[in-house]
Amino acid sequence: MSGWDDYIKLLFGKSPAIKRAAIIGSDGSVWARSGDANAFRATEVELKRFAALFNDINSVPGTGADLEEIHYIVPRVEEKLIFGKKEQTGFFAAKTNQAIVIAMYEGDNAQSASVRAGVEYIAQYLASSGY
């Protein structure tokens, strides 16, 4: 297990609603991803496109975002955060200087708050560590 995998485990511990997760570089390269029954299945092409969304984050609500071959509407973005939703599933992604933390979740809007908090916690820690 790499050190990056430990951050994935920590992220899962932040919310039971998190089903899959990854940490990618700002270029879309995979640093760590959940596996086995909770395998994060986004392709290399998807992740490169997804990482590029942060270059023009304010346009993302108009176009949405694709992960794991699913198109999500994006009702909200913030400076370094994208929130995607489709029915009872969604994702939060937070960008640091070098990394993007992504958590895919299942559940209602009330559960999404803990997912967001977990993603932001990991992202803030990575940013404070120089990533």
Swiss-Prot record:
Gene Ontology cellular component annotations, sorted alphabetically: cell cortex; cytoskeleton
BP terms from Gene Ontology: muscle thin filament assembly
A Gene Ontology molecular function term of the record: actin monomer binding
Compartments (UniProt record): Cytoplasm, Cytoskeleton
Keywords (A to Z) from UniProt: Actin-binding, Cytoplasm, Cytoskeleton
Cited function: Binds to actin and affects the structure of the cytoskeleton. At high concentrations, profilin prevents the polymerization of actin, whereas it enhances it at low concentrations. By binding to PIP2, it inhibits the formation of IP3 and DG.
Family: Belongs to the profilin family.
Listed name of the protein: Profilin-2
Naturally occurring in which organism (per UniProt): Caenorhabditis elegans
